[in-house]
Amino acid sequence: MIATGMAALPLHAQTARHTLRIGFQKSSTLMILLKSRETLEKALAPLGASVQWYEFTSGLPLLESLNIGNLDLSADVADAVPPFALAAGANLTYYAIETPSPEAQAIVVRQDSPIREIAQLKGQRIAFAKGAGAHYLLLEALAGAGLSIRDIEPAYLSPADARAAFERGSVAAWVIWDPFLAAVQRQANARILRDGKGLSSYRRFYLAATPYAQRHGAVLAAVYDELRRAGEWVKQHPAAAAQWHAPLIGLDAPTVEAANRRRTYQVQTVDAASLDEQQRIADAFGSQKILPRRVVVADSPVWRRT
């Protein structure tokens, strides 16, 4: 494991004028907060960095863009996403985590569905985003019922397409994360069949392109500090945070507040426990022949604040 920090480069290399390109998604609450307030633009200006923002529908396309050089930093993605990117050869640095929020993703069915337990998903069409945390949650839930991914019919859909399919009844279940989970509960009366408790901790990972992490440790340190402050504010001011966030993602404030209650928003540096779980996730996907090759998480660089 390589610790990536700022000490190896002279100051002028770290403060040279450049643009930090950040990818995020609707579940990236803290980055959306920083974006809406232009917090990073102000904090990074003394370091010579401006900021550009790019929105994605889910985590895997975000990390693919990071890997091919179109982004420098990824907002939080679910715990299953990095192993997929690493299996594809991505040169990514583990940057930070949000501590576990296992109830912030779940397998849901319609309220009138006869399905009451995971074993009844056998042979059913189930919607989820490939490579998302939802994918791993489904894998673990099925395994607990003596099933595998081969026992169901996967419907790899974006959250918007999956919501439409769920409401039409063209899928029997949907595996989804907040805030989409809270939205379908409140707006479509979806019933939780199983959440992540005891199956998937649902840590959320921030990642950086390794070349960027090697050259711009001071910028990453400043972003990290702002993420921590943003997380503390959201948890300390839940109603205000929901009122602010809701119009930015097209939801009502009570739905956003319900979603935020299930997330910790506690930002930390990447620790051994989170990397160990990353390896377990990679091995679980590998055992089902879902990944093209074995992933060794310990081979990936880890950013350390210096």
Labelled PLM ranges:
Residues 1-14:
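N-terminal export signals
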Residues 14-145, 155-156, 172-176, 200:
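Short, glycine-/small- and polar/acidic-enriched structural segments
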Residues 31, 101-107, 190-191, 202-206, ...:
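Small-molecule pocket liners
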Residues 38, 42, 64, 68, ...:
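Solvent-exposed, polar/charged alpha-helical surfaces in well-ordered, non-transmembrane soluble domains
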Residues 80, 154-155, 160-247:
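Pocket-lining segment of extracytoplasmic ligand-binding domains
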Residues 111-119, 147-149, 211-220:
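Short helix-loop capping/hinge motifs at secondary-structure junctions, enriched
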Residues 214-292:
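Secondary-structure end/capping motifs
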Residues 285-306:
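Conserved C-terminal helix/tail region of periplasmic/extracytoplasmic solute-binding proteins
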